[in-house]
Amino acid sequence: MPRSIEPDEVLSILAHIALPPTAPYHEWGVLDAIRSELERGGIPTKTDPFGQVHARVSAGGAKRALVFAAHTDHPAFEVIEASGKAGKARVLGGFRQRVFPPDVAVTVHGDAGCASFAAILTEPVADIEPLHNSTTVCRIDAEKPLAVGQFAVLDLPAADVAGDEIRMRAADDLAGCALIVSVLLALRGERAPHDVHAIFTRAEETGLYGARLAAEDGLLPRDAYVISVEASRALPGAEAGRGIVVRAGDLHNTFSNEAERYLRVARERLAERGIPTQRALLVGGTCEASSFVRLGWTATGIALPNINYHNAAADGGFAPEIVRLGDLLSGIALGVEAALAAGEDADESWWPDVRITPTVIRERLQRDRPKG
């Protein structure tokens, strides 16, 4: 049976990765945390020309390699004008709150690691900037002087755990990053053939940019199958608490049936162990699998059902995103089993029975119509 990883260790990994503030183009703290967790576990990492972290675990002669991909950013704000303690901040990424609250508490950060400080966002104004997937500019008033290029994140808990519920400032997609790290750690010492690559991407929320660059520049093995790992909007049929979701597609694209084959094999194996999983077309957003599919790669996805996706509270304002520990553990188990299924190029159990039409049926359908 494949190695597993204890829930307490998973939560420790998640807490470490979730702690640093992050935003599109400002993911350095999260990337450092991911690198630290992997290297502490004996898994070497490398960094590509775009600052994205890569890792790999393998054993034996795997018949197919997999690439797990998750992004290290989350919608946030960037200071675009500054005059003392006041200025303007632009939304970066997909905050589409139905009601933008009159006062939004944030914390301000710099990429060089300067001490953070509190600020308030007010006076939101519609200002469309497609390059950064941005719809809004706000006034920002801070406790300390501001500087253009600083970024601000919602003043919410990084990761609070209450039973099975994990309330996060940025479950999308730091929970997905923690899932992949846990899969790699769980595969250490596994002797069955497997070849698993991971990429932790940047600037997904503003345009899938990191994944697009990886695909455009061939930064991953071209014959590997890519699996995007997300914390995507919980929907009917893809509900929190019912296991990881095998994602057949997203808002814009249907993914690869061939890449999904290994996930389906993994689902069968997990079902035998009583581990729940789901399968759905998730139209709540667009994920990095779309980048790879549209650029000619074989790709699919999995997702953690995410309540309050992109911090959208029920009242229209901002709230922590919520994922379930059970779903996270389900996703780790699915990732490990999919890696082993790819290593042996496994098929679903039912496929051999239907691969070739029975001769008796072929012959029956070839008979001429009886004459009356």
Q: Language-model segments: which ranges?
A:
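N-terminal hydrophobic/helix-forming segments and targeting peptides
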Residues: 1-372
